[in-house]
Amino acid sequence: MFGQRQSLIVYLHSLKHAKILRKYGNIHYISKRLKYAVVYCDMDQLEHMMHKLNKLPFVKRIEQSYRPFLKTEFENSRPDRAKEYDYS
């Protein structure tokens, strides 16, 4: 149903132009203090979108999110202490 998606962190010179980013993907978050926007786009169009966004005059730099590539299953994690006790 849904394809693989990845977020791009787009650093801007000014937030005035943040609305223009809507046509390049779904805007998830805009930080006013740090002047960046998190834009989601399809994985297969990622390189193309980065190239198009880098051409825009109000974009400082773009970084890919590494969240899809991080391992989220941890091996030697300690069990929950509350679940150790059997209260039955």
From Swiss-Prot:
Cellular-component GO terms for this entry: cytoplasm
UniProt-annotated location(s): Cytoplasm
UniProt entry keywords in alphabetical sequence: Cytoplasm
Primary location group: cytoplasm
Top-rank taxon: Bacteria
HAMAP family tied to this protein: UPF0298
Family as reported in the entry's similarity comment: Belongs to the UPF0298 family.
Protein name: UPF0298 protein Bcer98_2635
Organism: Bacillus cytotoxicus (strain DSM 22905 / CIP 110041 / 391-98 / NVH 391-98)
